[in-house]
């Protein structure tokens, strides 16, 4: 059963026609990777789902409700979390203060223990300025801030950018735990081997359109697909 369904979305930036009829879906407890070359429209897809950019046509359905025209804060309240590229932390605020920006009420504050179980290092860094953390620790704060709102799905834009290999490996474990806890993931990722290792379904985007969809098993040994749509050989 679909948790999130994007249907024939058309999105513009000014006169630039970015998404040209893009469609995809994410099921419950599923990890979906959206891959494509630079400028294909991947980030715009996430921003459109999140309500940060409004499409001119098409629909976005979430838990059978239409969220296409909702502002971003209402999309978040419906249960969609978002971790943008670059993390967007407040560097001169502490880790705890950054996490509090994702809280709505005391019930959200109670989610901190769950966050610490995923990222134990954050418990030790609560009073440290976010700008002094390592790249991996900053990403942990960004993901935790989204998880505090108890989303049903989390959108992640280039989560491995700037991370050391040890934390990239840690992310694999985190993703597994999230899906085991019922949270789906829609992932935009530049590290193709990482994306293919975690995703259940992969969508390939070319110039604002989804040109190919495949399950993880279908892509094994099919280098020609990666070369055709991404220009790389993994």
Q: Across the structure, where does each feature detected by a protein language model lie?
A:
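Conserved ABC transporter NBD signature motif
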Residues: 58-66, 78, 108-117, 214
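Conserved ABC ATPase signature
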Residues: 129-133, 137
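Helix-to-loop junction immediately C-terminal to a conserved catalytic motif
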Residues: 50
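The feature captures the beta-strand-to-loop junction immediately N-terminal to the Walker
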Residues: 35-37
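Catalytic Walker B motif of ABC-type/P-loop ATPase nucleotide-binding domains
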Residues: 154-158
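ABC ATPase NBD coupling module
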Residues: 54, 66-86, 112, 124-127, ...
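ABC ATPase C-loop
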Residues: 146-147
């Amino acid at each position: 059963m679909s948790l999130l369904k994007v249907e024939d979305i058309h999105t513009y930036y000014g006169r630039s026609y970015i998404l040209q009829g893009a469609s995809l879906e994410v099921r419950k407890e599923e990890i979906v990777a959206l891959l494509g070359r630079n400028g294909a429209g991947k980030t715009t897809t996430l921003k459109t789902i999140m309500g940060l950019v409004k499409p001119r046509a098409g629909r976005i359905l979430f838990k059978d409700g239409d969220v296409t025209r909702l502002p971003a804060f209402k999309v978040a309240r419906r249960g969609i979390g978002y971790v943008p590229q670059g993390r967007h932390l407040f560097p001169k605020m502490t880790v705890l203060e950054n996490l509090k920006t994702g809280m709505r009420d005391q019930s959200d504050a109670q989610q901190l223990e769950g966050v610490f179980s995923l990222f134990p290092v954050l418990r030790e860094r609560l009073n440290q300025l976010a700008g002094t953390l390592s790249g991996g620790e900053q990403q942990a704060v960004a993901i935790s801030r989204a998880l505090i709102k108890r989303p049903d799905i989390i959108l992640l834009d280039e989560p491995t950018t700037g991370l050391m290999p040890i934390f990239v490996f840690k992310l694999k474990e985190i993703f597994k735990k999230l899906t085991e806890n019922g949270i789906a993931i829609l992932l935009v990722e530049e590290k193709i081997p990482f994306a293919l290792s975690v995703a259940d379904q992969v969508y390939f985007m070319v110039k604002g359109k989804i040109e190919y969809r495949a399950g993880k098993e279908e892509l094994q040994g099919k280098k020609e697909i990666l070369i055709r749509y991404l220009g790389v050989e993994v």
